Amino acid sequence: MKRLLAKSTATPDRPEGEATLLGHTALVLSAARRLLEHRGRASLLAAGLDPALEPRLRRIVLLAAALHDLGKCSEHFQSMLRRQREAPQLVRHEALSLWLCWPGQPLSAWLQRDVSELDLCLALVCVAAHHRKFQTEAFAPDGTGAGLSLELRVQHEDFARTLGRIAEELALSAPPLFTAPIVLRATRKEHPRDQLQSWQDDFERTVPAGSVDARLLAVCKALVLAADVAGSALPRSGEKQDWVDRQLTAPHPAEALRAVVERRLAGHTPRPFQEEVARSAAPLTLVRAGCGSGKTAAAYLWAARQHPGRPLWLTYPTMGTATEGFRDYLHGADVEARLQHSRAEVDFDIFGLRDGAAPGTSSRDQDRLDALRSWGADAMSCTADTVLGLVQSQRQGLYAWPGLCAACVVFDEVHAYDDRLFGCLLRFLEALPGIPALLMTASLPATRLDVLRGMCERVHGRSLAEVEGPEDLETLPRYQRLDVAEPWALVAECLRDHGKVLWVSNTVDRCMRTAEAGTSHGARALLYHSRFRYEDRVRRHGDVIEAFATEGRAAFASTTQVAEMSLDLSADLLVTDLAPIPALIQRLGRLNRRSTLERPAPVRPFVVLPFDGPPYAAPDLRDARAWMERLGTGPLSQRDLVDAWGPPGMMDAPRRQSSTWLDGRFDTWPAPCRDGSPSLTVLLEEDARAVLDGAVSAHRVTLPMNLPPESFKWRAWPRAGRLPYPIPPANALDYDGLRGARWRKP
């Protein structure tokens, strides 16, 4: 073995410099220095930490960057890169890096001559964290053929040269020289897992949750991972290291954001409500205003006036709303803007957004490059998960840190957050008080509002800044509930008058049955729900938007909950299944949406159909029925919907959400940001062939489904190459590009 590799290469005996352990370590160290120069102080301020900690932050991050890949001297890792090993590695390389350097281990005496034991341990926990698989995947499962021992090639010349470079870069004393490999054994009597458990117990007693050291550790983890991303991605993309400097020193002129607002307002002056939002200098501001009030333009004004020089990150609950936000405000604007979510590449192609900004995609290497590019953007439109994923050690959230820590952030449509996502929002706001934040919502339960107010008092020592929507617009009558059991006559009448009908069902099956019933009533429906191939779903979204935007032509859309946020349209009649109060308020936001003070429209009718069962909990539906009774059958405004929600206590108070980034300390692993439901993403057989042939990206054609019947034995379905998506047999599923997918009955 001539060289110790850190990265795969086609020529392992004559590798490129950046593929070697020495070369990659030098690149990551260089990136870490640049990150600390430009984002060290900003990172501390974002986390509410004393800027006087900057020298210590620098010491920990640089040490972690230097040591992060020493475990790649493992014979298992080297054989894997050379494709000489099919069995898993007995111990992952980042765990081995920690093992080599922890106090009492082979390299610790050298390191502790110049570094305190606590800071060494903090750095090593960052080392172990940099792939977010510690300790969950640190060791190969039993019975996988990984073996019971491995050699660490510490005697190799490349290992010695790497230690020498580290000593030179960090001004450490001369490193030790090894003359023989170190053998690590993993037997029942002697297993490194037991050592790690003991070290974890000691470390977490020394670094309690919530302590300054624990908060500093979280920041260090993010910076070390970002340095590794830069050191890995830039050489492969042909970029030079000074590219990081250019991204992190890019100016963010407030004039660019003001120009976005001026273009959106089309010559009109901002409303008093928008001016009030823009004047908020508070670290945390809550804006409660109904649909169509101009909240988003107000958010741009707020960023331009209160936080000039900071990039603006706008977050939305869904990929669809993130794309819509980008299209409406940033596409074609004279601003360095990015759209970031896992299907952004597809949206750019379908919507023709390639001029003026760049998308993000989700392959691992591309994710890294996209994250680096986001560091220098003036404005980012992304999903809430991109930002709040940081709290749960998700890849995109950690990658975003160098851009995010110096930004101001807008969280739009927070009423749409489920309990887990709202809990992540609270942890984010609590842990990062130095990042100015603007929350926007059409409505908010009293229990959530109380928690926000209490958190703001506790963290910032001041009351939550609250801005209400414009009184005259909020109280404009828009809706009227009709208490009818059979809505089809209303649908037919509306369509005869060239009106627009939106029917929202709580399940895809009900949505499809509604469309089928519409056909029998002479009303052809456009379908829009979640069970489409992604590119088909985007096209169906466009069909619905176009149909509702065309004046003088009837339109009928049968949809599911996806309509609550992603459809920016105005209906003349809304028919909806009973749903939780926040969902019903969102659905009503699609009814008579364009009515304004200048051009008020007559109130429009809505019908709520009885519903019980999944996906909603019985108490939520019970509260919704009581809310409906309070609303009555007279004309209603957006303010009426919120006021009828009821007194505090109708909903349970949000529980404190655990955070793997903030609470994990010794361990680091990704966790979900949202409440999940059982689902299965599949590839149709013809799409799988196209993906394997390179004719199409998997992200364009993946199909999200509910779990199929167990009788289908779906766990045994084949996969397309290394992709995680099963391929159902043709007789298991019906798919139509206009109607979507459903499982066949077994």
From Swiss-Prot:
Mg(2+) binds at residues 69, 131. GO terms for cellular component: cytosol. The keyword Acetylation does not apply. A motif (DEAH box) lies at residues 412-415. Induction: Part of an operon going from at least MXAN_7266 to MXAN_7259 that includes a CRISPR operon with transcription continuing into the pre-crRNA locus. Its cofactor is Mg(2+). Its EC number is 3.1.-.-, 3.6.4.-. GO terms for molecular function: ATP binding; metal ion binding; nuclease activity; RNA helicase activity. It is an enzyme of class 3 (hydrolase). One of its GO terms (biological process) is defense response to virus. CRISPR (clustered regularly interspaced short palindromic repeat), is an adaptive immune system that provides protection against mobile genetic elements (viruses, transposable elements and conjugative plasmids). CRISPR clusters contain sequences complementary to antecedent mobile elements and target invading nucleic acids. CRISPR clusters are transcribed and processed into CRISPR RNA (crRNA). This protein plus Cascade participate in CRISPR interference, the third stage of CRISPR immunity. NCBIfam families: cas3_core, cas3_HD. In the N-terminal section; belongs to the CRISPR-associated nuclease Cas3-HD family. This is Putative CRISPR-associated nuclease/helicase Cas3. The lineage of its organism: Bacteria, Pseudomonadati, Myxococcota, Myxococcia, Myxococcales.
